[in-house]
Amino acid sequence: MKVLKKLGAFLLHLLFFLVLVLLLVWVGLLAAKLIVYSDYMENKEPVCTLPDIHKGFVPQGLDHVADETYLFSGYHGNNMLSLYVSQDGVSKQILPVNEKGEDMVGHGGGITSAKDYVYIANNGRLLVYSLSELLAAEDGTKMAPRQVIRVDTEASFCFADETHIYVGEFYIADKYEIDLSHSYTTPAGDEHRALVSCYPLAEDGSLADEFPLYSISVTGLVQGFAVKGDTFILSRSWGLNSSTLEFYKGLKNSGKTVDVSGMAVPLYYLDSSNHEKTVKMPAFSEDLDIVGDRVIVSFESACNKYIVGKLFFADQVISYPIK
């Protein structure tokens, strides 16, 4: 009996010690975060909470529609494509289906809107929806896209302003390989393997031409892309490594072209020669959008798939100033 009591006391003390160690580690990591990500931590502002982040949703795409209305694209654990509409802090889920009524699959890496047109970047295609229909739909509504457009990139993310939509691809060696014709080494010696293609939009927000006006050569690990005037912004991340928010001034003309379905398209690039600033951020950054003079960014680290972000309160969309 005495042995059992001693064993119980030992285990209790051991448990207390382990909890104390874990608490100290957690506090230490929080403190380190303030130092490692000092610029980000000092200038970031919370925007809104990611929908269903603790209920299986893995957020990827992000779009600010107006005021407190946002669109989110992503997937659930079984790779089921998911779409959320968030208005004034209240979210509803729309379930994308194909023309047969079957659940669509994919990561839904980007989402953007122009007038009444909503575009989701998914598996080399743009899924086109009506914004007014999404806003009017009930929670849990199954909805097929109005149109599916094949594009020249892997369509990992997208961004639209009033006149153009940019559709880009994610690249990492040996894991997410893409068309070798998208490779380009810039004059500064930067080796690129991915493209962001710019398509014209009609006045009503629809795609005016299925051939891009031009393509932009970019580095790998790009999860999100946004443009404000002549400032181009990339969200880059992979795994538990720190994410980066990268700012570039203007586009550089390569003087070359890239082949898109037999059509020669002008090739521009973003590289170290027009890079202005890099902001270090916590891991798992995803899509971007522009709201006023700030860029907003979503993170997937707090979802149930990765968990780690739950320890650091990473369930929010964050904004950072464009300077």
Language model segments and positions:
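Short loop/turn segments immediately following the C-termini of beta-strands
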Residues: 74-77, 123-125, 131, 170-173, ...
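Loop/turn-rich, solvent-exposed surfaces of beta-rich toroidal or solenoidal domains
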Residues: 215-265, 278
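Beta-strand-rich domains and repeat architectures in extracellular enzymes and scaffolds
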Residues: 48-81
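Beta-propeller blade signature
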Residues: 82-89, 131-134, 181-203, 244-261, ...
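Conserved blade-ending motifs and adjacent loop-strand segments that build the rim/top face
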Residues: 257-291
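Surface loop/turn motifs at the tips and blade-to-blade linkers of beta-strand repeat domains
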Residues: 50-55, 95-103, 147-151, 213-219, ...
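Repeated scaffold domains used in trafficking and secretory/extracellular systems
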Residues: 56-63, 103-110, 150-160, 219-226, ...
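Blade-loop segments of beta-propeller domains
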Residues: 89-116
